[in-house]
Amino acid sequence: MKQTRALMEGAILISLFAIITLLVVYVPVIGTILLFALPLPMILYTIRHGLKLGIWMGAVSLPVVFIVGSFNGLIVAFMSACAGIAMGHFFKRKEPGHAIISGALIYMLSIVFYFVISIQFLGINIIDEAMTQYRQSLDIVETVAKQSGNAGQFEKQLKLMEEQLGIVQYLFPTAIVMVGVIFSFLSYLIAKPLLRRFSPDIPNLKPFRELKFPQSVVVLYLIIVMLSFLPLEKGQMLYSIALNGEFILGFLIFIQGLSFIFFYCHKKQYPKAAAVIAVILGFVHPVFMAAIRILGVLDMGFHIRNKVK
């Protein structure tokens, strides 16, 4: 009886998974939103029936999606199925934080996998294609500026944009990390109402003010900063490591600083608006961002929140 019920639920959720995949592939506007909901069937099934059956459901769903949704549907379905199974496993263990981390890692690995496949088998380098299109856009802007007689006015801006383009092409690893985390967190937010209904005993994430990264983040950041003082040239592996490490670790330290601000406001019973203003200022003004990073370093390195009374 239990196996029959599991098979019935699996068939229903596979059908739902295939339908959502079709909408993601063929209905652009709605599909963009549903992309973050695509792991839901796998999450629910893995929570209810465990990791082993969740993997079986994922394996069975892929041929179904390929038949009804072509190769494009299979690409999207594979990534979402793997993320959903991993997240469902940790939700079943009542570890929502680990669920988000595992989902983010799956998304990152999937993006890297697709990137390698596109280069090796399709001969398409997504980064080079994007950079080529961006350079063509700059050339068009420069041509229009010359024809209108405003070349001198736009010369500095175009030069700055070209310099930024030279840096952006090395930040692909940072983009992968950001996309993976955002996708996983949005999938969690969409899944949360259903999780409350089908598994009410799954705990909430800890409040943002209690977020605490390990001290090793600060140590790694200091190493990366020292590495950036070396005479590194673009194209070198160390240059890419230093650039991406500084962005990723610096962002984590910034988040830690924001967490401390929320903790301090909560402890002192200040209105939440004060913390929200700090967040806005931190994102829009580099001076405030630097100050918040300093708070993050002090909080991780010296545990200053323990001294707040």
Curated annotation (Swiss-Prot):
InterPro entries (alphabetical): DUF2232
- Family matches, as PANTHER family: DUF2232 DOMAIN-CONTAINING PROTEIN (PTHR41324:SF1), MEMBRANE PROTEIN-RELATED (PTHR41324)
Q: What is this protein called?
A: Uncharacterized protein YybS
